[in-house]
Amino acid sequence: ALVQLGQKDLLIDCQGNWGNILTGDGAAAPRYIEARLSKFALEVVFNPKTTNWKPSYDGRNREPITLPIKFPLLLAQGVEGIAVGLASKILPHNFNELIDACIAHLKHEDFVLYPDFPTGGMIDVSKYCDGMRGGNVKIRAKIEKDNNNRALKITEIPFGRTTSSLIDSIITVSYTHLRA
Protein backbone atom coordinates (compact mmCIF):
# COMPACT_ATOMS: atom_id res chain seq x y z
CA ALA A 1 0.00 0.00 0.00
CA LEU A 2 2.83 2.40 0.86
CA VAL A 3 4.55 1.77 -2.49
CA GLN A 4 1.35 2.53 -4.41
CA LEU A 5 0.88 5.77 -2.46
CA GLY A 6 4.54 6.69 -2.97
CA GLN A 7 4.32 6.21 -6.74
CA LYS A 8 1.54 8.81 -6.94
CA ASP A 9 3.86 11.63 -5.75
CA LEU A 10 1.34 13.52 -3.61
CA LEU A 11 1.36 12.27 -0.02
CA ILE A 12 4.69 10.50 0.37
CA ASP A 13 8.24 11.77 -0.19
CA CYS A 14 10.16 8.73 -1.41
CA GLN A 15 13.79 7.71 -1.51
CA GLY A 16 15.13 4.49 -3.00
CA ASN A 17 13.80 2.20 -5.71
CA TRP A 18 10.01 2.60 -5.64
CA GLY A 19 9.45 0.85 -8.95
CA ASN A 20 8.17 2.43 -12.14
CA ILE A 21 4.53 2.62 -13.26
CA LEU A 22 5.63 3.04 -16.89
CA THR A 23 7.75 -0.10 -17.12
CA GLY A 24 5.96 -2.19 -14.52
CA ASP A 25 9.18 -2.70 -12.54
CA GLY A 26 8.45 -3.52 -8.92
CA ALA A 27 9.81 -1.67 -5.92
CA ALA A 28 12.85 -2.84 -4.01
CA ALA A 29 12.47 -4.77 -0.76
CA PRO A 30 11.08 -2.63 2.09
CA ARG A 31 14.48 -2.44 3.79
CA TYR A 32 15.83 -0.51 0.77
CA ILE A 33 13.16 2.18 0.53
CA GLU A 34 12.52 5.19 2.74
CA ALA A 35 9.39 7.29 3.09
CA ARG A 36 8.05 10.29 4.95
CA LEU A 37 4.90 12.35 4.70
CA SER A 38 5.18 15.18 2.18
CA LYS A 39 4.64 18.81 3.18
CA PHE A 40 1.35 18.64 1.28
CA ALA A 41 0.20 15.66 3.38
CA LEU A 42 1.20 17.33 6.64
CA GLU A 43 -0.74 20.48 5.77
CA VAL A 44 -3.81 19.01 4.06
CA VAL A 45 -4.30 15.63 5.76
CA PHE A 46 -2.61 15.82 9.18
CA ASN A 47 -3.13 19.49 10.01
CA PRO A 48 -3.27 19.89 13.82
CA LYS A 49 -5.82 22.72 13.44
CA THR A 50 -8.38 20.55 11.64
CA THR A 51 -7.57 17.03 12.86
CA ASN A 52 -8.70 15.58 16.20
CA TRP A 53 -5.94 13.64 17.97
CA LYS A 54 -5.84 11.00 20.71
CA PRO A 55 -2.99 9.27 22.55
CA SER A 56 -1.52 6.27 20.75
CA TYR A 57 -1.76 2.75 22.16
CA ASP A 58 1.18 3.28 24.56
CA GLY A 59 0.57 6.97 25.26
CA ARG A 60 3.95 8.17 23.94
CA ASN A 61 2.60 9.67 20.70
CA ARG A 62 -0.62 11.10 19.30
CA GLU A 63 -2.58 9.68 16.38
CA PRO A 64 -5.46 11.15 14.39
CA ILE A 65 -9.00 10.05 15.19
CA THR A 66 -10.28 11.10 11.76
CA LEU A 67 -8.67 12.69 8.71
CA PRO A 68 -10.75 15.72 7.64
CA ILE A 69 -9.00 16.39 4.34
CA LYS A 70 -9.15 19.91 2.86
CA PHE A 71 -8.80 18.63 -0.71
CA PRO A 72 -10.66 15.97 -2.79
CA LEU A 73 -7.76 13.54 -2.45
CA LEU A 74 -9.75 10.52 -3.59
CA LEU A 75 -10.32 12.15 -6.98
CA ALA A 76 -6.68 13.21 -7.29
CA GLN A 77 -5.23 9.80 -6.44
CA GLY A 78 -7.83 7.55 -7.97
CA VAL A 79 -8.66 4.19 -6.43
CA GLU A 80 -9.61 0.69 -7.49
CA GLY A 81 -10.67 -2.12 -5.23
CA ILE A 82 -13.33 -4.46 -3.96
CA ALA A 83 -14.72 -4.97 -0.48
CA VAL A 84 -17.74 -6.89 0.77
CA GLY A 85 -18.89 -7.63 -2.76
CA LEU A 86 -18.82 -4.00 -3.94
CA ALA A 87 -16.29 -3.05 -6.60
CA SER A 88 -15.09 0.53 -6.92
CA LYS A 89 -13.00 2.30 -9.54
CA ILE A 90 -12.41 6.04 -9.39
CA LEU A 91 -10.08 7.39 -12.06
CA PRO A 92 -7.35 9.91 -11.12
CA HIS A 93 -7.84 13.60 -11.90
CA ASN A 94 -5.56 16.59 -12.45
CA PHE A 95 -4.59 18.46 -9.27
CA ASN A 96 -5.01 21.97 -10.72
CA GLU A 97 -8.31 21.11 -12.39
CA LEU A 98 -9.62 19.76 -9.06
CA ILE A 99 -8.69 23.02 -7.31
CA ASP A 100 -10.47 25.02 -10.05
CA ALA A 101 -13.52 22.73 -9.75
CA CYS A 102 -13.59 23.17 -5.95
CA ILE A 103 -13.51 26.96 -6.33
CA ALA A 104 -16.26 26.83 -8.97
CA HIS A 105 -18.37 24.59 -6.70
CA LEU A 106 -17.97 26.99 -3.76
CA LYS A 107 -19.05 29.87 -6.03
CA HIS A 108 -22.05 27.79 -7.23
CA GLU A 109 -20.68 27.84 -10.79
CA ASP A 110 -20.84 25.01 -13.30
CA PHE A 111 -17.67 23.09 -14.07
CA VAL A 112 -16.58 20.09 -16.13
CA LEU A 113 -14.10 17.60 -14.72
CA TYR A 114 -12.57 14.71 -16.63
CA PRO A 115 -10.02 12.07 -15.56
CA ASP A 116 -6.35 12.80 -16.13
CA PHE A 117 -3.70 10.10 -16.02
CA PRO A 118 -0.11 10.24 -14.72
CA THR A 119 1.20 8.30 -17.74
CA GLY A 120 -0.46 10.68 -20.22
CA GLY A 121 -2.11 9.36 -23.35
CA MET A 122 -5.09 10.59 -25.32
CA ILE A 123 -8.49 10.17 -23.73
CA ASP A 124 -11.94 9.76 -25.30
CA VAL A 125 -14.62 10.88 -22.83
CA SER A 126 -17.61 10.71 -25.19
CA LYS A 127 -19.15 7.90 -23.06
CA TYR A 128 -17.91 9.14 -19.65
CA CYS A 129 -21.40 9.97 -18.25
CA ASP A 130 -19.88 12.50 -15.80
CA GLY A 131 -18.28 9.66 -13.83
CA MET A 132 -21.58 7.94 -13.14
CA ARG A 133 -22.11 4.19 -13.21
CA GLY A 134 -22.03 2.67 -16.66
CA GLY A 135 -19.79 5.32 -18.18
CA ASN A 136 -16.37 4.57 -19.61
CA VAL A 137 -13.32 6.22 -21.08
CA LYS A 138 -10.92 5.03 -23.74
CA ILE A 139 -7.23 5.82 -23.49
CA ARG A 140 -4.78 5.55 -26.34
CA ALA A 141 -1.05 5.98 -26.60
CA LYS A 142 0.23 9.27 -27.98
CA ILE A 143 2.31 8.57 -31.08
CA GLU A 144 4.42 10.99 -33.13
CA LYS A 145 6.16 10.55 -36.46
CA ASP A 146 9.95 10.76 -36.30
CA ASN A 147 12.98 10.52 -38.64
CA ASN A 148 11.36 11.93 -41.77
CA ASN A 149 8.16 9.92 -41.22
CA ARG A 150 10.06 6.60 -41.22
CA ALA A 151 9.57 5.79 -37.55
CA LEU A 152 6.87 6.13 -34.91
CA LYS A 153 7.73 7.47 -31.47
CA ILE A 154 5.44 6.62 -28.56
CA THR A 155 5.60 9.59 -26.18
CA GLU A 156 2.79 8.71 -23.74
CA ILE A 157 1.30 5.33 -22.85
CA PRO A 158 -2.24 4.49 -21.70
CA PHE A 159 -2.91 4.43 -17.96
CA GLY A 160 -2.67 0.92 -16.53
CA ARG A 161 -0.38 -0.31 -19.31
CA THR A 162 3.37 -0.78 -19.10
CA THR A 163 5.91 -0.30 -21.84
CA SER A 164 6.46 -4.05 -22.08
CA SER A 165 2.72 -4.83 -22.38
CA LEU A 166 2.40 -2.12 -25.05
CA ILE A 167 5.32 -3.59 -27.00
CA ASP A 168 3.79 -7.07 -26.75
CA SER A 169 0.45 -5.84 -28.12
CA ILE A 170 2.20 -4.04 -31.02
CA ILE A 171 4.13 -7.21 -31.87
CA THR A 172 0.95 -9.30 -31.76
CA VAL A 173 -0.92 -6.90 -34.05
CA SER A 174 2.01 -6.60 -36.48
CA TYR A 175 2.32 -10.41 -36.79
CA THR A 176 -1.42 -10.67 -37.41
CA HIS A 177 -1.30 -8.05 -40.19
CA LEU A 178 1.86 -9.48 -41.77
CA ARG A 179 0.24 -12.92 -42.11
CA ALA A 180 -2.89 -11.48 -43.73
Tell me the role of every PLM-derived stretch.
Residues 1-136:
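Catalytic phosphate-handling regions of large nucleic-acid enzymes and associated NTPases
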Residues 49-53, 147-152:
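Gly-rich Lys/Arg/Thr-decorated short loops/hinges at beta-loop-alpha junctions or inter-strand turns
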Residues 176-180:
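Conserved small/polar residues in nucleotide/adenosyl-binding loops
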Residues 19, 140-144, 155:
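Residues in well-ordered beta-strands of folded domains
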Residues 151, 155-175:
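Long hydrophobic segments that form regular secondary structure
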Residues 133-144, 150:
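Fungal transcription factor middle regulatory core
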Residues 86-88, 143, 156-159:
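Flexible glycine-/small-residue-rich
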